[in-house]
Regions:
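Bacterial N-terminal signal peptides that target proteins for export
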Residues: 2-12
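Generic extreme N-terminus detector
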Residues: 4-6, 25, 61
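A short aromatic-anchored loop/beta-hairpin motif
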Residues: 27-175
Length: 175
């Protein structure tokens, strides 16, 4: 019961933060940088009450990160002891059920992103945790970051069908 209340609070808090930080418009066609909000009738427990940030959407398919679920994995338990990312006691967020061996990071930077990195919305990039750990300009450039284990994925056309079925609401964010 306590875990359910915590999850609901976490979901509500995440949505409030996202709404406070962005101008939100409803959209019907998904694009990279948009949020997917799970419909309350969505039966898959991995996505129930979920909010997903699309980090990729093209003719080959879509990928995203669940932004409102934590995990019990600590970053320090996975990365080497000499990693620059293990000192602050962060835990990994649950990014989704696809490839739980993948470690990704969303990074908000001042000027220049790590290489390689893909811009999701203006100033917010997705990259591998290893790239972030090896980035020499980390302390000078990073405003904030969040790490994820796994991601969500859809085959070509699959996400569009789920949106038409009413499984997801699409929110356009303008950072």
């Amino acid at each position: 019961m306590l875990l359910k209340r915590y999850s609901l609070r976490c979901c509500c808090l995440t949505l409030l933060v996202l709404l406070a930080m962005t101008n939100v418009l409803h959209a019907t066609t998904p694009e990279k940088g948009m949020f997917l909000v799970a419909d309350e009738q969505l039966k898959d427990p991995r996505f129930r009450n979920g909010v997903i940030l699309l980090i990729q959407h093209n003719e080959q398919g879509s990928a995203g990160l669940v932004v409102n679920r934590g995990s019990r994995l600590s970053l320090s338990a996975i990365l080497p002891k000499d990693s620059s990312l293990t000192g602050d006691g962060r835990t990994l967020s649950y990014g989704g059920p696809v490839d739980p061996n993948t470690l990704l990071a969303l990074v908000k930077v001042r000027n220049y992103p790590p290489e390689p990195a893909d811009e999701v919305v203006e100033g917010l990039y997705v990259t591998g945790v290893g790239v972030l750990d090896e980035w020499t300009d980390f302390s000078a450039e990073v405003v904030s970051y969040r790490t994820f284990v796994g991601y969500t994925g859809w085959a070509a056309g699959q996400l569009g069908a789920e949106i038409q079925r009413g499984d997801w609401s699409v929110l356009q964010a303008d950072a």
